[in-house]
Amino acid sequence: MRVDGRKCNQIRPVKITRNYTKYAEGSVLIENGDTKVICTASIEDKVPPFLKGRGEGWITCEYNMIPRATQVRKARDINRGRIDGRTMEIQRIIGRALRSVVDLRAIGEKTIWVDCDVIQADGGTRTASISGAFVALVDAVNKLHKQNPFTIYPIRDFVSAVSVGIVNDTRMLDLCYLEDSRAKVDMNVVMTDSGEFVEIQGTGEQNPFTREDLKELLALAEKGIKSMISAQKDSLKMDSLWIGTGGE
């Protein structure tokens, strides 16, 4: 039995609240157990200099935790004068995950800024951010599509993420903070609805792990991601119908 009473192959309860803020084209509060993240998607009618004139768009992410999202207050990056390595890594993985399922040429020369702000952290903040950010992205893209329909609808598939690990010699899905802090092996997995992998981040925190461990952890992750994508679909309802159609 786990610390919160779940089975080893269960994710925490997931709740996705859309249109959570007033101004962003897409905004979501995602709650994954006691982890809570506000995700917004904002559209800008320009692209970074390296994409100017190429006829394609860009999706980029900023990730942050409010100071008391954690048990002990963490100073804001601005007060430290730099973005720490963990924050930079998480921003990049969220951006890569979203870009992997979007036809950037179909967007045209626009940038979609995704902001993920953790307001309460209990493990899995990066994976919850990816899952919530995708829903915010869909809402933002749909607003563009309704205003001026795309020739090709840009979003090709759902994408979501989950953590898995080995705690007390037991393989577990969707680790809370206490489990994550005790994990001998810790892994974050990003997958699409069609079952393709976008990213696998795996580390033997205390011990090496076997090929069999990897196989079983990926199977657990796939099960969890199916549940997360089901929550995304339940949240989006009819607004997800264009995904993967090319706009037909």
From Swiss-Prot:
It catalyses: tRNA(n+1) + phosphate = tRNA(n) + a ribonucleoside 5'-diphosphate. Its EC number is 2.7.7.56. GO terms for biological process: rRNA catabolic process; rRNA processing; tRNA processing. It comes from the Bacteria. PROSITE patterns: RIBONUCLEASE_PH. Phosphate binds at R86, G124, T125, R126. GO terms for molecular function: 3'-5'-RNA exonuclease activity; tRNA binding; tRNA nucleotidyltransferase activity. Disulfide bonds: none annotated. InterPro entries: ExoRNase_PH_dom1 (IPR001247), ExoRNase_PH_dom2 (IPR015847), ExoRNase_PH_dom2_sf (IPR036345), PNPase/RNase_PH_dom_sf (IPR027408), Ribosomal_Su5_D2-typ_SF (IPR020568), RNase_PH (IPR050080), RNase_PH_bac-type (IPR002381), RNase_PH_CS (IPR018336). Keywords: Nucleotidyltransferase, RNA-binding, rRNA processing, Transferase, tRNA processing, tRNA-binding. Belongs to the RNase PH family. This is Ribonuclease PH. The gene is rph.
